[in-house]
């Protein structure tokens, strides 16, 4: 699947600062310490609607990680999926009287346009679930063979499920207790009451074909993948086991990331699917959670059509820390645009305070669990001084502009 063109990223001079990130599984900030090539998998969209600001905040978080790692001299093997086989896509397509494949392609194209406008670095591998069906079938077969999966006793719909007790470490990624797991499983696409399951938490691996649903042939009979096994297969086949970062929104901690990890761990015998589990918080609107059910989603494409500078969207979402639930509002956007105008005026100044010193601080702040509030505050103070009184560094404006482009993904000019 084709993604989108990546913007050019300037090369930064000066010493690198090792990246430290909060690991959900350890509930602590830990050093990432990748090798020459850092592997990162981020769960992608289900393409039944346009990209909203909650999506954007997640992908901008991992774009920052990508940029910090690259600035530190690492190559990044970035993999992202598209969940183009899923119930919400089928339901929306049926509601709108459109083929689910056409809807998925249309919304994936719009997502790519939004990511390009936001200057998000594209993944090296951008893989749809439809493209990975054979990989899923192979993984399901291995899990059945080693006893980590079973077929429910249902002659009409013999679905395949993963045994939650297949590995002794199940639950380490989220750290949730049983009651919390059961609640989130029911709320987030699980089927705890499905007759024939051995445990209410057992996760669907292969859904036997139902009338009116797309299906693919397999040794287990015609059907389609479950949600979690798609990401497990895609990541395993491109990054292996023990890659650096598994990422997504905080709503994916459980069940999605817990089970994706468990599927691969049960297949390979390894104890840790990824070395770090990193999650971005949720975005609300005017103090309320942003959600489909509330009808208060703010779409990136809508803001773009209204003439909003995508760089202002980036800065508005960077105003708060990535792990803090936060609200979007007209005031947030206005502050972001004012900040962007100030910075661009400073980049055009004849001189400024010491640019290299500021860049060093920016690298330290972003390497410290992506502390964008500190980074933005430091840039504001520098820019205000550059605009009002200049400074002793004639190269400062260009030095800082290059760093802002490389690290924050904000272009010097509109």
Curated annotation (Swiss-Prot):
L-cysteinyl-5'-AMP binds at residues 43-46, 58, 81-83, 227, 249-251, 283. One of its GO terms (biological process) is mycothiol biosynthetic process. Binds 1 zinc ion per subunit. It comes from Tsukamurella paurometabola (strain ATCC 8368 / DSM 20162 / CCUG 35730 / CIP 100753 / JCM 10117 / KCTC 9821 / NBRC 16120 / NCIMB 702349 / NCTC 13040) (Corynebacterium paurometabolum). Catalyzes the ATP-dependent condensation of GlcN-Ins and L-cysteine to form L-Cys-GlcN-Ins. SUPFAM superfamilies: Nucleotidylyl transferase. Zn(2+) binds at residues 43, 231, 256. GO terms for molecular function: ATP binding; cysteine-glucosaminylinositol ligase activity; cysteine-tRNA ligase activity; zinc ion binding. A motif ('HIGH' region) lies at residues 45-55. The gene is mshC. The lineage of its organism: Bacteria, Bacillati, Actinomycetota, Actinomycetes, Mycobacteriales. Its cofactor is Zn(2+). It comes from the Bacteria. The keyword tRNA processing does not apply. Monomer. Keywords: ATP-binding, Ligase, Metal-binding, Nucleotide-binding, Zinc. This is L-cysteine:1D-myo-inositol 2-amino-2-deoxy-alpha-D-glucopyranoside ligase. Its EC number is 6.3.1.13.
